């Protein structure tokens, strides 16, 4: 037997911060010779039946839970001493009931009536008898013989009786919630941190305390001052969950075991509960690490019922890629788990709950366990490879998302129900103020949207919020003593998914009065929403519209009262939030769809923002309030950030967050698919009666994409992420895919209306009759110099990849390899994109001075050339070649259709003139010069034998579409071949555009590229060809964008719109164009298809032809294979585990660099 340790043992409270005792055999008996005098109290605790130490036959708690942490029993114990230990499994026989042994256990004599009640109900089991005595359950059996009463729970009074009958219990009452209120009691195990005799005895009261840890000292770092720890994420040190119990004098004698301390500490720290302990058993001679059993009385504090602050827009935010859990996330998780654990321990059950949440607690704990495991993995990976983490983080955007991705067939299955559109759905006619004619499917959508908005339940009895549970305050404590009651407060309410408590009945607010219009791109979502704005107006708006003439004073109108939150109702106004590039389109579409004077629109952006939106839109200004306020996601985020900086104080705010709009519409709603982004949280906070989300893709590739939309719409109870995670995310990540997908389908079905362009009506007709669309791949051959640049970058990237494969560091160097692949893609567009700009500028200057002596420029107007040569001809020294040159230029101007002297084609293809003014086809001349050069001969003119070179060749350019020319003959210019020749892709594009201009001189086209710098290189080529063009990219202000789109729509004649894929890939209506040129492929063709659908959409009347330029034998060709397999280079796929995802990324890179 081990010797007692002194007070200053290594496990003294001042020397150890871990709530777990040291790893050694615990002493449940003092010494063999002490067994008869020291009662074995580890099995004599007044604990509830749910606790593992003791059990009650009346409760359905598995016996296998008993003493699951007691691993060893004393050897060579006498029959009597062995009977004092609880069995650790059901196989061990239980000692029979014996009065002498029983009284030895409890350390007291009992009366005959108590002994009779215990003996008759313990089933001849000594353990059950001890339990019944200490937890007081024997009393209910005694009461049965005196007066009838409803049975009470064994361990505590936390199970409240049915309140259906009258109570005649004299209890103390008050009218105010006290600082704390008893809720129940439970048993816990602790361990001693001090040695001594008679330190604790049965029945002693101990204090349950948390010692506040001093903040770590700030470290000074030179002149920069102290370095403070980051507040955003949890510190890497071990978490402090130590819970101490002390005597009344304040002397610490022990700590709670870690299992209980984990959640008890959270309840104390969060100021939810206060605990008071009673010693059930402690050895008379206490030694460090001895087991002590306590009964904890728990009281809920008044502060637990306070609400949380404004900044927590979501119930919990997502952890970013490979980052630690934030302090707020950890606090919320521990608060949730602690409340669930507490109610389990005190055997407290709700008297009213939602049927959907009955099994939620198990899932909630499972979700918390998964989060905890993830955090352990993150900390482990942080410790093993910090550089790798930083590398990975740098490659991710600030909106990195969590959650596993869906396979395509799973995504299709999710949409199947939403797309099972009933073509017999009733139709609704738009209001007479609406100026457009809706198609049948659009009228059906209008009926569906109006039904969703008008589905109000104000006449029904208020229902409890589905996330909350109702509990009743106990009437008696664990010792059957009456508890003071609060008048009008017999119940309280708990939300286990958010950790909130309330004394007031949590009424379920009006369910979602809106939805998701998820029609495929090009089916007219904007028009359908505008028809809803016209058709469904509030009563205040209708009254204001009818009375605007009859009443001279707007103060005579019915008003909605102001509330104390500084949020005013805007009953006449619909707020539209859209990407900046779509603001002008919404405004113009609203004007087109409205009859004159029926729709007031307000652009709330930049300099156009109203100084006081609240005064403009409030009910008291109903007659003058705008019907439609259009703003951008950026403005919403900006105002939300300003409001958050004031801790949500709206008293000084008169912008978007100061109003409760009649309706809010977010366009391109996939902008908020990441629930943890600031933009998403800002949109959640906007107040509105009706909420709509417009997107062609409500789920992009993760289930969490849908959650963010559900959160925005306020769909109870799914807008709570803990609830969503419990019933959807956890089953999905645990492999129960069908269960999770079934639940998501039930969420989607009532919320989403989705139609696609390939749907057929019952008559077999397409839903929308669109003109045909042809997509053609144009293979581009790189020139020798371009191929040299490409090969150089390709070999460098391949070498880097091979080296990292050998070293096993591919994922660590993923960003570097990916950047080199990006360089490869840029070199396919134009070599200059990957070169130093200064070097390129020097080369341009040198080339410009090459022919200065001859006075020839790269671009020359033919008229000025003829004038120049005519002037020379008039001189006395009339040289024959100059005279012939003037004559040749006049022939070109007069469109003399001479045949090519080399290939004998008539007329010439891309007519080109030599320095000696002889003409031939451009290709013929270049091939002729190359043939001469290959034979090591000096190239000479095929006609006059003068020396020629590529730099002396000028291509004839006719400006056929020049509407400014008054002359019948178009202007003609010469452009030097070679100097102005751009990359192979630009040359191919210009060839297509020239051919298109000849065939369709009035055609409009859109040129897409993901590289804005490449668009800048296309501009000079268009200028030289005298092709009119406009440009729209992300760097332009909203007004400039609106002007460009308006000019492109209104402009007559051959026009090109240069558009960046990011700025113009979504939302825009470009049906005035008929041709699309995709200059470079994207990883997913879906992104390109989105851009193409800006042209091929409802309103398009002509056939749309799409040309996709792809460089042969390059990374672009291999990207098409990646597209065909529906893969993404930067993301993982489907149900792969982390290792499989890494391997898949490596395989993708191998294919791109093969």
Swiss-Prot record:
Gene Ontology BP term (one): DNA repair
Protein localization: Cytoplasm; Nucleus
Chief localisation class: cytoplasm
Annotated Polar residues bias: 75-98, 383-398
Broad EC category: hydrolase
Coiled-coil regions listed: none
Binding site for ATP: 519-526
Domain Helicase ATP-binding residues, every copy: 506-716
EC number(s) reported in the record: 3.6.4.-
UniProt-listed SUPFAM superfamilies: P-loop containing nucleoside triphosphate hydrolases, RING/U-box
Protein name: DNA repair protein RAD5
The species this protein was found in: Gibberella zeae (strain ATCC MYA-4620 / CBS 123657 / FGSC 9075 / NRRL 31084 / PH-1)
């Amino acid at each position: 037997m081990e010797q007692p340790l002194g007070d200053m043992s290594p496990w003294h409270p001042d020397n150890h911060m871990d709530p777990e005792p040291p790893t050694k055999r615990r002493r449940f008996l003092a010494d063999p010779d002490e067994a008869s005098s020291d009662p074995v109290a580890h099995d004599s605790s007044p604990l509830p039946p749910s606790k593992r130490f003791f059990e009650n036959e009346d409760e359905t708690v598995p016996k296998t839970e008993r003493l699951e942490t007691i691993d060893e029993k004393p050897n060579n114990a006498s029959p009597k001493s062995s009977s004092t230990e609880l069995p650790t499994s059901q196989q061990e026989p239980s000692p029979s009931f014996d009065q002498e042994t029983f009284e030895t256990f409890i350390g007291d004599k009992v009366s005959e009536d108590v002994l009779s009640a215990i003996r008759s109900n313990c089933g001849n089991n000594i353990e059950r008898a001890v339990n019944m005595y200490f937890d007081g359950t024997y009393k209910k059996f005694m009461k049965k013989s005196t007066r009838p009463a409803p049975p009470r729970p064994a361990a505590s009074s936390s199970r409240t009786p049915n309140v259906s009958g009258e109570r005649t219990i004299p209890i103390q009452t008050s009218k105010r919630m006290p600082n704390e209120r008893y809720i129940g009691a439970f048993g816990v195990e602790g361990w001693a941190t001090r040695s001594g005799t008679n330190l604790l005895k049965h029945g002693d009261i101990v204090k349950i305390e948390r010692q506040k840890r001093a903040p770590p000292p700030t470290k000074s770092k030179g002149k920069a001052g102290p370095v403070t720890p980051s507040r955003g994420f949890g510190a890497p040190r071990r978490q402090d969950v130590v819970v101490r119990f002390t005597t009344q004098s304040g002397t610490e004698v022990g700590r709670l075991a870690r299992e209980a301390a984990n959640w008890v500490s959270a309840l104390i720290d969060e100021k939810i509960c206060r605990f008071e302990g009673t010693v059930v058993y402690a050895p008379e001679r206490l030694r460090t690490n001895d087991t002590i059993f306590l009964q904890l009385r728990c009281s809920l504090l008044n502060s637990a019922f306070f609400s949380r602050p404004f900044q927590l827009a979501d119930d919990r935010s997502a952890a970013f890629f490979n980052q630690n859990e934030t302090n707020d996330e950890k606090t919320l998780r521990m608060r949730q788990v602690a409340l669930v654990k507490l109610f389990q321990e005190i055997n407290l059950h709700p008297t009213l709950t939602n049927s959907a949440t009955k099994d939620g607690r198990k899932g909630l704990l499972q979700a918390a366990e998964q989060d905890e495991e993830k955090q352990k993995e993150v900390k482990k990976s942080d410790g093993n490879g910090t550089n790798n983490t930083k590398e990975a983080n740098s490659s991710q955007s600030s909106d990195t998302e969590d959650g596993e991705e869906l396979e395509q067939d799973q995504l299709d299955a999710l949409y199947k129900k939403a797309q099972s559109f009933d073509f017999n759905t009733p139709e609704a006619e738009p209001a007479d103020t609406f100026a457009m004619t809706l198609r049948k499917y659009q009228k059906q959508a209008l009926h569906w949207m109006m039904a969703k908005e008008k589905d109000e339940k104000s006449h029904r009895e208020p229902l409890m919020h589905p996330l909350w549970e109702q509990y009743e305050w106990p009437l008696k404590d664990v010792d059957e003593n009456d508890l003071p009651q609060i008048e009008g407060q017999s119940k309280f309410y708990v939300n286990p998914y958010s950790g909130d408590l309330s004394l007031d009945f949590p009424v379920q607010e009006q369910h979602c009065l809106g939805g998701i219009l998820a029609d495929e791109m090009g089916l007219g979502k904007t028009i359908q929403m505008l028809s809803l704005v016209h058709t469904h107006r509030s009563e205040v708006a209708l009254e204001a519209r009818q009375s605007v003439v009859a009443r001279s004073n707007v103060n005579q109108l019915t008003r909605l009262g102001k509330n104390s939150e500084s949020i005013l109702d805007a009953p006449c106004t619909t707020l539209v939030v859209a990407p900046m590039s779509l603001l002008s389109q919404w405004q113009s579409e609203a004007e087109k769809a409205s009859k004159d004077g029926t729709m007031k629109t307000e652009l709330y952006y930049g300099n156009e923002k109203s100084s006081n939106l609240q005064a403009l839109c409030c009910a008291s200004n109903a007659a003058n309030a705008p019907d439609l306020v259009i703003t951008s996601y950026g403005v919403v985020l900006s105002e939300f950030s300003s409001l958050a900086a004031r801790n949500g104080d709206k008293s000084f705010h008169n912008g978007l967050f100061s109003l409760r709009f009649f309706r809010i519409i977010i366009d391109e709603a996939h902008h908020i698919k990441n629930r943890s982004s600031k933009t998403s949280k800002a949109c959640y906070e906007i107040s509105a009666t009706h909420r709509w989300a417009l997107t062609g893709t409500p789920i992009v590739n993760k289930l969490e994409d849908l959650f963010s939309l559900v959160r925005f719409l306020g769909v109870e109870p799914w807008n709570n992420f803990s609830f969503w995670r419990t019933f959807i995310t956890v089953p999905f990540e645990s492999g129960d895919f069908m269960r999770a997908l079934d639940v998501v389908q039930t969420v989607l079905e009532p919320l989403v209306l989705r139609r696609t362009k390939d749907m057929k009506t019952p008559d077999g007709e397409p839903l929308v009759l669109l003109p045909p669309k042809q997509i053609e791949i144009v293979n581009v051959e790189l020139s020798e110099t371009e191929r040299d640049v490409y090969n150089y970058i390709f070999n460098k990237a391949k070498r880097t990849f091979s080296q990292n494969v050998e070293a096993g560091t591919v994922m660590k160097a993923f960003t570097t390899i990916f950047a080199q692949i990006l360089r490869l893609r840029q070199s396919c567009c134009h070599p200059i994109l990957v070169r130093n700009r200064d070097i390129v500028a020097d080369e341009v200057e040198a080339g410009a001075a090459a022919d200065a002596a001859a006075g020839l420029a790269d671009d020359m107007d033919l008229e000025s050339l003829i004038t120049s040569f005519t002037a020379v001809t008039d001189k006395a020294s009339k040289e024959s070649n100059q005279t012939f040159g003037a004559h040749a230029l006049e022939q070109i101007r007069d469109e003399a259709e001479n045949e090519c002297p080399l290939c004998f084609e008539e007329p010439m293809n891309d007519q080109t003139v030599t320095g000696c003014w002889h003409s031939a086809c451009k290709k013929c001349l270049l091939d002729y010069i190359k043939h001469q050069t290959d034979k090591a001969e000096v190239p000479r003119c095929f006609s006059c034998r003068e020396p020629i070179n590529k730099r002396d060749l000028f291509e004839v350019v006719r400006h056929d579409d020049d509407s400014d020319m008054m002359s019948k003959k178009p202007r003609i210019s010469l452009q030097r071949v070679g100097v102005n020749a751009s990359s192979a892709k630009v040359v191919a594009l210009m060839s297509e555009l020239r051919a298109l201009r000849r065939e369709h001189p009035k055609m409009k086209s859109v040129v897409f590229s993901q590289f804005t710098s490449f668009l800048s290189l296309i501009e000079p080529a268009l200028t030289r060809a005298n092709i009119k063009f406009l440009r729209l990219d992300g760097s332009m202000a909203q007004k400039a964008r609106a002007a460009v789109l308006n000019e492109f729509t209104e402009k007559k004649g051959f026009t090109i719109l240069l558009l960046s894929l990011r700025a113009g890939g979504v939302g825009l209506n470009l049906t005035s164009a008929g041709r699309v040129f995709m200059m470079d492929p994207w990883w997913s063709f879906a992104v390109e298809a989105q851009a193409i659908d800006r042209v091929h959409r409802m309103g398009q009347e002509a056939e749309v032809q799409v040309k996709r330029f792809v460089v042969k034998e390059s990374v672009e060709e291999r990207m098409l294979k990646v597209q065909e397999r529906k893969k993404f280079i930067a993301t993982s796929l489907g149900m792969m585990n982390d290792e499989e995802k890494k391997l898949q990324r490596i395989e993708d890179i191998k294919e791109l660099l093969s």
